[in-house]
Amino acid sequence: MKKGYITQVIGPVVDIRFEGDLPPINNAIKIPMGDRELVVEVAQHIGDNTVRCVAMASTDGLRRGMECIDTGGPIMVPVGKGVLGRMFNVLGQPIDELGEVKDVKYMPIHKKPPSFEEQNPATEILETGIKVIDLLTPYPKGGKIGLFGGAGVGKTVLIMELIRNVAIEHGGYSIFAGVGERSREGNELWLEMHEAGVIDKTAFVFGQMNEPPGARMRVGLAGLTIAEYFRDEEHQDVLLFIDNIFRFVQAGSEVSALLGRMPSAVGYQPTLATEMGALQERITSTKKGSITSVQAIYVPADDLTDPAPATTFAHLDATTVLSRSIAEMGIYPAVDPLDSTSRILEPHIVGEEHYYVARKVQEILQRYKELQDIIAILGMEELTEEDRLIVYRARKIQRFLSQPFFVAEAFTGTPGKYVPLKETIRGFKKIVEGEMDDIPEPAFYMVGTIDEVYEKAEKMK
């Protein structure tokens, strides 16, 4: 064990001098502080036998000359079946007051991404049971999905429904990394997962808003390491939820400024693309298993060209855009069917029928959007017979894209629905081909499959 001593402390940044060999970049160094132990991570070698480190917790109480011990490797987090149903901080210490973690191994949070030979391109759909997603923005198994949305449009509810559906319908594991999250939201999610009965299929890692930037910057990697173990050693298909990827970038920007690096565009860190790549390149499918990641992305001032969301875009396979105008209509999940995209919505991947139905749905909705100005000024009577039909079908499609969620049962009083992909395609095909033209609009709202529309229409007679 190499030992050194503190030479200077500037906020969350600590300089430590070692005689002889210096610990390499990314090594964890422990600083004993009486009843607790502070962990710092080596960020730079600044010459004169000194390393500059970033703290993972508050540096209150540190002083010059204190002894520091190099652990000889990066931060290690617990992995394995023992982490399921538990909640950890960035250092892998349990924060749920349920005692010690049992039945786990420890792995470093820094490692190389899988090589090209090991990778397996994502060309298979992960069925979510959510109609609008499966039809228009199919999620690739082992792909990366971005969830763009403002406050209060339902990002968290959508994430919770996805965790529930994957756990119950697919029997898969989910890892949730709260990066710069509100502690309240983390607590709500924890309680929701208990109520939904899927807590034993889920592991949580949190680095909340109130923690130093070092912790917020590394918590995503800690969650990813747990997911990688399930993929590589247990050969599982895992879901990794990161909320919020923007806070990861923000923490990196704070650390960069503290380390004295010159800022680049819009004041972000010059290493923005490298840091994002180091995280994103490890989230991938291999021949052993897959990691499918759903990442909530906050868009500063609704500007998608801001360096943070713009850098994230380059890595994504599918984008789900949540829209306030759709939420205002009472249609949940409030996914924008025209703004959301998916790389795998191609006929050779999803099949001709799925592709045809999805494009037809978008075509009808796009035409309806164009006609809305005319309707607002002149009314429906001025439209041609053909356009009127498109409007009626579009309104039915809009309502049929809504769906009752399991995790929202307590609020809506409507039991949740899981809709298989085949049923989703069959339902929308009937609408676009005119088979449902004589069924009233309200019958399409908040139902699961198309058969339920018939049942609802019967009751309305």
Curated annotation (Swiss-Prot):
What is the topology of this protein in the membrane according to its UniProt annotation?
Peripheral membrane protein
Which keywords annotate this record? ATP synthesis, ATP-binding, Cell membrane, CF(1), Hydrogen ion transport, Ion transport, Membrane, Nucleotide-binding, Translocase, Transport
Q: Which GO terms describe its cellular component?
A: plasma membrane; proton-transporting ATP synthase complex
A molecular function (GO) term: ATP binding
Q: Which Pfam families match?
A: ATP-synt_ab, ATP-synt_ab_N, ATP-synt_VA_C
Give compartment(s): Cell membrane
First-level EC class: translocase
- Please state which protein family the record places this protein in: Belongs to the ATPase alpha/beta chains family.
Subunit comment? F-type ATPases have 2 components, CF(1) - the catalytic core - and CF(0) - the membrane proton channel. CF(1) has five subunits: alpha(3), beta(3), gamma(1), delta(1), epsilon(1). CF(0) has three main subunits: a(1), b(2) and c(9-12). The alpha and beta chains form an alternating ring which encloses part of the gamma chain. CF(1) is attached to CF(0) by a central stalk formed by the gamma and epsilon chains, while a peripheral stalk is formed by the delta and b chains.
**Role of this protein:** Produces ATP from ADP in the presence of a proton gradient across the membrane. The catalytic sites are hosted primarily by the beta subunits.
Question: What name does the UniProt record give this protein?
Answer: ATP synthase subunit beta
Task: Tell me what organism the protein belongs to.
Answer: Caldanaerobacter subterraneus subsp. tengcongensis (strain DSM 15242 / JCM 11007 / NBRC 100824 / MB4) (Thermoanaerobacter tengcongensis)
